[in-house]
Amino acid sequence: MKIKHLKYWISQTRELSLLSECVRKKFGCLIVDPDTNCVLVNGYNGGPRGGDRLCGGETCIRNTCNIESGTQNDIGCNHAEANAIVNSARLGISIEGKWLFVNGEPCINCAKLIAQSGIARVIYLEGGYLSNDGIAYLLKNHVGVFPVSLKDESSLRSVLQPTFKEVRIERSPFK
């Protein structure tokens, strides 16, 4: 994968987020195979498949209840990362060792799903979310975390370096 691909995938998360009907924030997520440079699945935040378009039916329940962004993550729509992971399960696509691109920091609930699913790296645009609990959780659970800026090539270059976890696996005597 090259820097131009990283820029493209990150920009595509922003485009994908435009499909969300959430009135508060719009997130898009892609899960990409770094070996083939192909998108496996995607997701954006919104109501459940076949259900209401918003978490409160025709209104945003988080707005109705005055819930501050970054808190009470169990209330509201399905997040982009969760939708992408669920889509992979629904379609029978393994995402273990793959890279997840999202246009904002994952919340703690999405971080738990990401770590459990076996995602190797999370590449995200900084500033999309008001909490860093999810980032701390991912780091604690050995998921590579890469905040990037489309204007900062050094942040993009760091994504292409092997992580400790990957280096350790590559040097395994059991291969």
Regions found by a protein language model. Give the residues of each.
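Zinc-dependent deaminase catalytic domain
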Residues: M1-K175
